[in-house]
Amino acid sequence: MSASTATTQGIPRHVAIIMDGYGRWAARRRRPRVIGHRAGARAVNLCIDFCLERGIAALTLFAFSSENWGRPADEVGALMKLFLNALDREVGELHRRGVRVRFIGERSRFDAGIIARMDAAERLTAGNSRLALSIAASYGGRQDIAAAARALAVEVAEGRLDPADIDENALSRHVALADLPPPDLFIRTGGDLRVSNFLLWQLAYTELWFTDTLWPDFDAALLQQALDDFAARERRFGLTGEQVATASTTDTIAS
């Protein structure tokens, strides 16, 4: 893959975000953690608006990790209630704006009411194409890769796949978001410098961008700063800078 095929005029095709800092935002205001999660909904809508305005094709948000089930029961319960309310409140408007909604992760761990709404949101928006919004809920990157490996094992056991044919492309077909380009830009708010088991396979060549800003305070100016920094980087995909420059020139002439 050349750098020129990954983006259009420096605009990433796919942005992935870890929305971190809800609890600290609330603690600084001496409020319960759930208040931080409620405040973070504004930043989610802002990012969706931004992607629609800039023509970014895909946005993936890490909403709830597989490890988050281990948090205190009252916090998990409050988060599930917020999640349910958000599905009821936002999906119709997302559909009206041409957003396709999808959920990745272990859906079976949610209660029946949430699963039904997730399924309904995906059915309602399946034909939309302005923005592919993927919400990682009860998701873990290692879990994702393990599930892909199990799928390949089934194909081998059923005689549909020769083990000698298992390569990166074969596994890529079975991980989450297989129908989307890999994320070009990863953003994490809240100051931590790690990917926290998020899209481990998909982030192999993604540009990483971190900010100390807590998620409820994330705004369009910061998102634009992330895009500006992304546009200034040279993405080499394992090649030398000279090779990338030559490929970019060739692509420009061909177009």
What is each model feature region?
Residues 1-255:
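Flexible, compositionally biased loop and terminal segments
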